[in-house]
Amino acid sequence: MKKIINMTILVVFTYVSAILPAYSAQCTNDTWNKVMKRGKLVVGAKADYKPWGFKDSSGKIIGMEADMAQAVADIMGVDLELVAVQSSNRMQFLEQGKIDLMIATMSDRKDRRKIVGIIQPNYYTSGTNVMSPKALGLKTWEDLRGKPVCGKQGAFYNKIVAERYGAKIVAFTGNAEAKQALRDKKCIAWVYDDSSIMSDLSSGNFNDFEMPFNSEDDNPWGLAVPLGEVNCVFGNFMSGLSFMMHQNGTLMELEKKWGIQATAYLKAKNKEYGDWLAGK
């Protein structure tokens, strides 16, 4: 990991230096300058979504996204402070200046790009999948055809598996009820967002279950800087760093470290951004 970070430092700073002149006229770079002067980067991260962001026994926030935040701070040469955020307040914290950067399992959506500066390329993704008992040995989505599948009322995942694969949806008012019905064998699987499923599988409460399929319907995640800095030093720095984390395999390495089921998305990005002459 350290070797990868050190290799990234030179490349990212070279990239940022190259784009600085183009944006210097219209950018104040307030957040970037504040971080560098203060010597500390404040990052908003989830603290209740294992394994991406959660608290250990000492109360420290750890996880894949916490490691990403540490890598950013290391490359900037500053200390790191992690602030726990929730889906309901993460963008507001960034808008209000309570955090400098947000890495918090946030889906990249058009409406959100009007509020915060979502960086490209997206660093991760979530999608549709199911959790099912290992004993059933489900292999493909077609295994759901004609079978009862538990879901949460109103979730769009239900419609996807019903129309695409002919599953018979058994809808419940909440996910807790749906997962209990799965335990009670009222259905062969629970359909939902794969990151939520992975969080459950990482909790230790579902050791007899698995996520058997390749996820579908990618919903990319974006880290974010303040909106006014997305095309300035900080935004371009983070864009270059996100690119490098894909290219050099850092994100795949972190995924493996935290026991997250390998995603086709990271593999595809690593290949897409890879050096075509590598190994030749």
Model features per residue range: what roles?
Residues L41-V42, V78-D79, Q96-A104, P148-V149, ...:
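Alpha-to-beta junction loops
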Residues A25-T105:
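Extracytoplasmic small-molecule ligand-binding "clamshell" domains
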Residues F54-S57, A69-V78, W141, G154-G174, ...:
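Ligand-binding cleft/hinge of the Venus flytrap
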Residues Q70, D74, D79-D143, D208-E210, ...:
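Acidic, polar ligand-binding/catalytic clefts
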Residues D67-I75, L138, E142, K147-P148, ...:
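Extended ligand-binding regions for polar small-molecule ligands
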Residues A66, E81-Q92, L136, G154-F156, ...:
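Short helix-initiation/N-cap motifs at beta->coil->alpha
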Residues A25-Q26, T31, Y157-F172, D208-F213, ...:
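Ligand-binding clefts/hinges and TM-proximal coupling segments of bilobed small-molecule sensing domains
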Residues Y124-S132, M198, S202-S242, Q261-K280:
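Periplasmic-binding protein-like
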